[in-house]
Structure formats: C-alpha cells, structure tokens
Amino acid sequence: MQSNIPRAAIHVGKDKKSFSAQVGNEAERRGWDENVYRLKNADKEKNNHYNFSRKNLNFEIVKDGKIVPLGSNPIPLHERIQMRLDELGFKPYMDARHPDQVSKNSPNCTVGMIFSGDHDVLYNLAFGNQRIDTANPDADHSHIVLQQGIYKWAKDTYDFVCRKWGEENIISFAVHCDETSIHAHVQTIPVEKVKKRGRIGSKYVNKNNPDIVLSTKEWRALPKEERDNYTKHTASKDYVERVSYAKVWGETRKAKSEYLSQLHTDYHNEVGRKYGLARGIPYNDLSPEERRDNT
C-alpha cells in the first residue's frame, strides 16, 4: 500500500449504552481552565498535547448549520443526549442487582465518531500560512486566527452527517483546534423510522369546504344524495421514530462492516474529495506513517 496518501479519516467509537457527564465535558471543554490543560498534558501515558492558548479557536456547529464557540449551549452534552432519548421514548434496561446502573444487555443508544484527515491538509485549512507547532502544548498561539477553510470543511461534514442520520439526531458537532491535529467529534443517536401498526383509515373531505372532514362512519350516516359532495382520501400510515443501533449500523458484524465501508465511500464522494483527501480506510489497514498522520 502506498504510504503518506492524504486521506480523510472516520473513527467510530465504542458502542455506548449510556453517556457520562465527564466524557461530555471533555468534548465541550466545559470547566477546562489553564490548570486543567496542564494536568491533562502531565499524563505522559496518554501523550496529550492540549494547548490552552488555542482553546478559543474551538467551535461547534448547531441547528441550521450555525457556527458558534465550543460550549455555547448552556445544557451539557450528556443532558442533551438524555433529552433526545426521552423524546424518542427510549428506556434502557437497568441492572437488577444495581438499579442505578444500566444493564450490560441494554441496547446501544448513542454513537460517537471523529471525523478528521491528513494533518497537513487540515492544518492548512485551519491556519493557512501561519506557521505554528501544534505539538507544543506550551506555545503561545493567542494571536492565531482561524481561517475560513476549516469552517467550510466542518460545515460540509456537518451537512453530511445531518443527511446521514438526521439533524435532530446530531446531538453534538464539536471541532477541536487545540490539539495536535484538527478533528470533529460527532455524537449521534441511532434512529430508525417504522410505520405505525394498525389499519389504514379513510377520510371524506367536502368538495366545497375542505375544512369539513368526516370519518367513514360519519360519511355513511349521510343521506345518499349528500355523499357525492365528499371526496374520499386514504390516509397513509404515519411513521414513528425509535432508537435502534442495530437497524442503523447493522445487525451482524458483516452488516456493520459493510455500513462502515459505505460510510467511508459516501464521505469521500460528498466531502473528502473536495479537499484533496483520498477515501478513508480502516485504521488497522493504515501504514504506520498514515496512522500517525490521521490521528
């Protein structure tokens, strides 16, 4: 495999049965002051390179594609996830022995992804000809101005995930510019649409006054000469939304693999190629150089 090809990258996180406040606060940098950045970088095992002076460059995209500073929503991410799950009527299975904990066999209810790509490509989109060392957590980058290119890439990626899973199910789209490589964290709820059960009913609409609508029973009760004043309309079945990881991402390992492969292809066709990024491939198939450049 040819190495060092500028590629797009999509990393899908572990399946989630719940979502913690701690994970959400990190994604949105809530409560992250300079001391928190320092403590994060002190963890040598994780090899972090968070730069506090670039915190103000982080941003998120919210409903209708509006770009705002990261953490602008007063409602924390974990609470927004729960709000959407409540709207969908999702109830996790609770552990019988530990009623306050979600059971291990509870369905997955949220999926997190990281969209990124070749370090140099995204660097140029974000910083242009401003030369900075993104791997230096102590450098002063307070003078750096984020370029329009990275906003366009993020907006294109946001539009893509909205088309894929529905804007109402994109709970967070957070772009981090304070680490070594630029990337977007996307937190979603997997939702399928299913037809409501039951018989499909009909209604009768008055030809002269559309506001007059009768049920079949009411229409039949009319004198025969009056029935001709109504037009029959067959009601289509409505759809209901429900949380279903398996129906969205695949019910088998093979189906999930095929879904992920198609996801990479679709993202390349709709977004990646616009920015000179080749189609992403599974992380384990990357060369060592590509693993370094795409994480």
PLM regions: where:
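N-terminal nicking endonuclease/strand-transfer module with a His-rich metal-binding environment
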Residues: 1-295
